[in-house]
C-alpha cells in the first residue's frame, strides 16, 4: 500500500502539468505587494549605459504564454513560477543591478499569430529590454524572425535578446540566422544522442526502430539517433508518424515486423501512450526509449485510462523498464532536498503555483535570467545582455541535477547539453542510470 500511495500522490501532483486548468498570470509588475526589502545600496553599473526597458528603479522584461489556457496547455504555470521567483528576488534581495525586475506577461493563446502580435506590443509599446522563456517551436518561429531582425532589412544588428527559449529545436543554435536567440532546455539532438549512447552501451546488438513526429521536433530525433548510433545497420526502421489511429497502428506493426527490439519514441504524450497501448494489444514489447518531453506520469495516466490509483499503476507497469532522460530535480523524488524546500517556500510565500515539474523549470530558467542580468550591470543594454548571456559558463541553477550545467558562448547558443539517463520504475519513480551524459 505504501507504493500505491506514493505512486498515486506523485502522479496527481505531476499531472498538474498536463491536466490542471491553466493558472492565469496577468501582465505587469512582478510584485503583487509592496517590497519589504531595504533600499539597495549602490552597485557597479548603476549609472552606466542602459537600453529600453531600464530605468533607475526597474528592468522590464517580456514574456508571452498561453496564460488563459485557451489552447489547453499547462504552460501558464511556468510564467507564474517566474513571477514568484522575481517577486522573491525583488523583496528579499533588492532586485538585480540595484533595480527591481518587472516581468510583463501577455497571453498569446499558444498561436504563432498571437505570439508575434503580443511580442511586438511588448517591444514597441512597452519597451521591454528583452524577451524570455518563449514556448513552442511553431509558435516561436515568426517571433524569433522578428526579434532577430525587427525591421526586416536583413541586418540583425538591431535585434532584441530572445533569452532562454523553452523549445528544443536544434535550429535555434544557428547563430548566423538567430544571433539574438539563446536556448535553455536541452536541444532535441542532444537528447537523441544521449538515448543513442544508451543504445550503443547497453543494447549494442539490438535492432532499432524510430517513431517520430513529422515536424522539427521529430526530425531532430531521427537525425540525432541515426548519426549517433555506432552500428548504422542496426537502425532497421525510421518513420515519421501519422497520429491517426489506423495509420499509427500500421506504422507500429511495420516497425515490429522489421524485428526492431528497441524503439525510440519522439512523440507527444498522447501519441506515445497510444503506441504503448497498441503495442501491448499486439504482444509487442521492445525496449522503449522515450523523449524527455514525455512526463512519465502523463504517459501513465493516458495508458491507464485515468487518475485513479489502479489506473496509474497500470500505466506505470506498462512503462516499467522504459528509458528516458532528465536534467532538473524532481518535484517528487527530490522533495526533501534543500533546493526543493526553498523552491516550495518561494512558491508559497510569493503567490506561485503548487510545486510541480513546471514550477521547478520556471524557477530554474528565472535563475539563469538573473545571472545574465547580474553580468550586464555595467551596461544594461540589449547588446550588453546578449553578451552577458553568451558569457555563461558552468552555471548551475539551484534546481538542476548535480553534474548538469549551462554553458554558452558567442558561437554556442545551446544552453544545456547534459542529461541524466533514467529508467522508469513500476511505482512511477525514476532510477538513475550511471552519471549524467554531456554531449557537445
Question: Model regions: which residues?
Answer:
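Sec-dependent bacterial lipoprotein signal peptides
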Residues: 1-22
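Short, low-complexity, disordered segments immediately C-terminal to signal peptides
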Residues: 25-44
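Beta-alpha junction/loop-to-helix N-cap segments that form part of ligand/metal-binding clefts
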Residues: 29-32, 46-47, 73-80, 92-172, ...
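Extracytoplasmic "Venus flytrap"
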Residues: 43-58, 62-83, 108-112, 135-136, ...
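Hydrophobic alpha-helical segments within soluble ligand-binding/sensing domains
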Residues: 115, 183-207, 246-249, 272, ...
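Extracytoplasmic ligand/sensor domains, especially the bilobed periplasmic-binding protein
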Residues: 128-239, 287-321
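Extracellular/periplasmic periplasmic-binding protein-like sensory domains
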Residues: 280-363, 432, 436-438
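Segments of small-molecule ligand-sensing domains
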Residues: 349-359, 370-429
Amino acid at each position: 500500500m505504501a507504493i500505491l500511495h506514493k505512486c498515486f500522490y506523485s502522479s496527481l501532483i505531476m499531472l498538474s502539468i498536463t491536466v490542471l486548468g491553466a493558472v492565469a498570470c496577468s501582465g505587469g509588475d512582478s510584485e503583487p505587494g509592496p517590497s519589504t526589502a531595504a533600499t539597495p545600496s549602490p552597485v557597479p553599473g548603476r549609472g552606466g549605459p542602459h537600453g529600453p526597458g531600464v530605468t533607475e528603479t526597474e528592468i522590464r522584461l517580456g514574456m508571452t504564454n498561453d496564460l488563459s489556457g485557451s489552447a489547453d496547455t499547462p504552460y501558464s504555470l511556468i510564467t507564474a513560477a517566474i513571477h514568484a521567483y522575481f517577486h522573491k528576488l525583488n523583496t528579499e534581495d533588492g532586485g538585480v543591478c540595484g533595480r527591481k525586475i518587472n516581468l510583463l506577461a501577455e497571453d498569446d493563446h499558444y498561436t504563432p499569430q498571437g505570439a508575434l502580435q503580443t511580442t511586438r506590443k511588448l517591444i514597441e509599446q512597452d519597451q521591454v529590454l528583452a524577451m524570455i522563456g518563449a514556448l513552442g517551436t511553431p509558435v516561436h518561429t515568426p517571433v524569433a524572425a522578428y526579434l532577430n531582425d525587427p525591421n526586416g532589412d536583413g541586418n540583425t544588428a538591431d535585434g532584441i535578446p530572445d533569452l532562454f527559449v523553452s523549445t528544443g529545436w536544434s535550429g535555434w543554435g544557428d547563430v548566423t540566422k538567430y544571433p539574438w536567440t539563446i536556448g535553455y532546455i536541452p536541444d532535441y539532438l542532444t537528447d537523441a544522442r544521449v538515448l543513442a549512447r544508451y543504445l550503443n552501451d547497453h543494447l549494442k546488438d539490438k535492432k532499432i526502430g524510430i517513431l517520430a513526429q513529422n515536424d522539427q521536433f521529430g526530425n531532430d530525433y531521427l537525425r540525432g539517433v541515426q548519426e549517433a548510433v555506432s552500428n548504422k545497420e542496426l537502425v532497421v526502421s525510421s518513420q515519421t508518424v501519422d497520429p491517426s489511429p489506423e495509420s499509427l497502428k500500421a506504422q507500429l506493426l511495420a516497425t515490429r515486423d522489421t524485428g526492431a527490439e528497441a524503439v525510440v519514441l519522439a512523440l507527444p504524450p498522447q501519441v506515445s501512450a497510444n503506441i504503448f497501448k497498441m503495442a501491448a494489444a499486439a504482444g509487442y514489447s521492445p525496449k522503449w526509449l522515450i523523449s524527455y518531453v514525455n512526463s512519465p506520469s502523463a504517459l501513465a495516466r493516458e495508458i491507464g485510462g485515468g487518475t485513479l490509483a489502479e489506473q496509474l499503476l497500470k500505466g506505470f507497469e506498462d512503462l516499467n523498464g522504459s528509458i528516458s532522460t532528465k536534467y532538473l530535480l524532481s518535484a517528487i523524488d527530490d522533495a526533501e532536498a534543500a533546493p526543493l524546500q526553498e523552491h516550495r517556500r518561494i512558491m508559497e510565500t510569493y503567490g506561485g503555483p503548487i510545486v510541480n515539474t513546471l514550477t521547478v523549470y520556471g524557477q530554474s530558467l528565472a535563475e539563469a535570467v538573473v545571472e545574465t542580468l547580474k553580468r550586464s550591470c555595467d551596461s544594461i543594454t540589449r547588446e550588453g545582455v546578449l553578451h552577458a548571456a553568451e558569457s555563461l559558463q558552468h552555471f548551475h541553477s539551484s534546481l538542476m541535477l548535480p553534474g548538469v550545467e549551462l554553458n554558452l558562448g558567442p558561437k554556442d547558443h545551446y544552453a544545456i547539453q547534459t542529461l541524466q539517463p533514467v529508467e522508469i520504475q513500476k511505482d512511477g519513480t525514476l532510477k538513475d542510470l550511471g552519471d549524467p551524459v554531456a554531449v557537445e
